[in-house]
């Protein structure tokens, strides 16, 4: 077994330091980042990995106590999640951001072990496979706060492209002020000119 996970720490620092904070998915501000175990699940390509890196960069100026690791990294071919958690803990780590947990066999037991045996450790995990996340969730339901992230709305896409930034409009406002709202928007930009592009590529922000 080759335990030294320095490659993971170097990778974590590089990815978090290089991620942009210019645009964040709306769910970023809706997530409560305080619970000890936080899960984020959703389809591939909707920005889960970026959320983790943005939170590290924004919330941990000193990243010595935080580690981002994708569980499909080759390091896990010869080492276990338990190995990593123990190493991180004895070196003063307090936060783990675990990406692609569904790629790791029995991931749910690994996270349960962290919760039960490392009370000072905080974990945020993501998974793309909805079925596997849900199968494993029964044992985490009392421990993890789960969040669902979907693809970008057309409004998010326009903001992501720098075309138009517009606050969310409630259904009541749409029903009572739809003509006024539509006029305000179209006076700024002809949004339908960009709708085809959104349908082709805008749902998943990984295309940039």
Put a short name on every predicted segment.
Residues 2-6, 11-15, 136-208:
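Interdomain motor-coupling "hinge/lid" segment immediately C-terminal to the ATP-binding subdomain
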Residues 15-33:
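Pre-Walker A adenine-sensing motif
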Residues 40:
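Hydrophobic anchor at the beta1->P-loop junction of P-loop NTPases
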Residues 44-45:
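Walker A (P-loop) phosphate-binding loop of P-loop NTPases
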Residues 48-49:
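Conserved lysine of the Walker
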Residues 63-95:
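Short glycine-rich substrate-engagement loop in P-loop NTPases that contacts/grips substrate
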Residues 97, 122-128, 148, 157:
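Structural recognition of the conserved hydrophobic beta-strand(s) that form the central parallel beta-sheet
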Residues 108-129:
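Conserved catalytic/switch belt of AAA+ P-loop NTPases
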């Amino acid at each position: 077994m080759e335990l030294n996970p320095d490659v993971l720490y170097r990778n974590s620092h590089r990815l978090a330091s290089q991620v942009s904070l210019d645009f964040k998915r709306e769910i970023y501000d809706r997530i409560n980042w305080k619970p000890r175990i936080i899960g984020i699940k959703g389809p591939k390509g909707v920005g889960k990995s970026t959320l983790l890196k943005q939170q590290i960069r924004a919330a941990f100026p000193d990243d010595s106590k935080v580690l981002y690791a994708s569980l499909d990294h080759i390091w896990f071919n010869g080492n276990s999640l338990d190995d990593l958690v123990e190493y991180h803990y004895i070196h003063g780590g307090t936060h783990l951001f675990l990406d692609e947990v569904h790629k790791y066999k029995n991931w749910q037991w690994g996270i349960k072990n962290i919760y039960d045996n490392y009370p000072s450790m905080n974990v945020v995990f993501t998974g793309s496979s909805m079925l596997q996340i849900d199968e494993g969730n029964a044992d985490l339901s009392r421990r993890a706060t789960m969040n669902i992230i979907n693809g970008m709305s057309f409004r998010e896409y326009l903001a992501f492209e720098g075309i138009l930034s517009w606050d969310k409009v409630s259904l009541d406002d749409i029903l009572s002020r739809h003509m006024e709202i539509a006029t305000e928007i179209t006076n700024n930009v002809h949004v339908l000119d960009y709708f085809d592009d959104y349908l082709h590529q805008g749902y998943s922000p990984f295309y940039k």
